[in-house]
Amino acid sequence: GFVISKHRRLSRKKSYENLLIGGPTGSGKTTTLLFKTICNLENCSLIINDPSGELYHLTSGFLSQTRAIKTLNFSDSSKSSGFNPLERIIKQTDCHKVAEMLVASQQKGHGGGDPFWGLQSQALITLFIQLLLYQEMKYRNMANLVDLVNWFASAPKAIDRIVVKAGDAKLLSEYKALISFPQRTLQNIVASVKASLKIFTDDEVAKVTSFDSLNFAELRKAPTVLFIHNSVGDQRYFSTLNAIFFEQLYGYLLSELPDKDALDVFFVLEEASSLYIPLLPLALANLRKYRSGSIICT
């Protein structure tokens, strides 16, 4: 279980109920508690938010003897596993969730405005995600979602043809409803969508999200440690990606109770106060039923 002092630790079952660690910088939270917890937890998978990379350097060599080690770094594609949010879209609800998070992250801190623009931005993003899913697998990524929006703004007739070619009557009907808005209104919606997708114009982000090498199902089957390396200073910039990643991961873990042979999954969220994870309160309240627990370190 989680280590709570030099000679004490929680039981595995009690660790499902989460642990909050607080203390000033230099108080030994990382080296005294987190390091020991990470090295002593066995027969499980770990998701570790490690902005500074300190935990990776302290533990990855030891952990690699018995577990698969992966990293997720949105600012450095050469050191990162791939994470494509579109890879996990199975039904229309999943499209709506991704679109909602993209728009909500962009509007965070700007409450009180007309909800019309946010709702229509979500509708347009949802529509274009669905359109991408009709294309070959290699084209289904966030950079191409940005391209679709840009083509829609500059060459709408090309998008008309792609929509018709998809052969989806419902999609075509929704597209017709969208383009029926007055030109000025449509331009404002597109501008709002571009702002929501701006992060994916970053070359490194585009590369990391162009493919997917993170299989959430493997977390329950084989001991795996995933280190998330995005510096504290970059958390606001990558807030959209963090929100989508944790939304999809928590959603997967909460989708069904694990069988008796499945591995536990634990989270170590260093510098948790800098993360934007809308689903975190709900996840903390419910994950114990799914044999998962979290250390929240502030």
Explain the meaning of each model-derived region.
Residues 3, 10-293:
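P-loop NTPase motor domains
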Residues 298:
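H-loop/switch region of ABC-family ATPase nucleotide-binding domains
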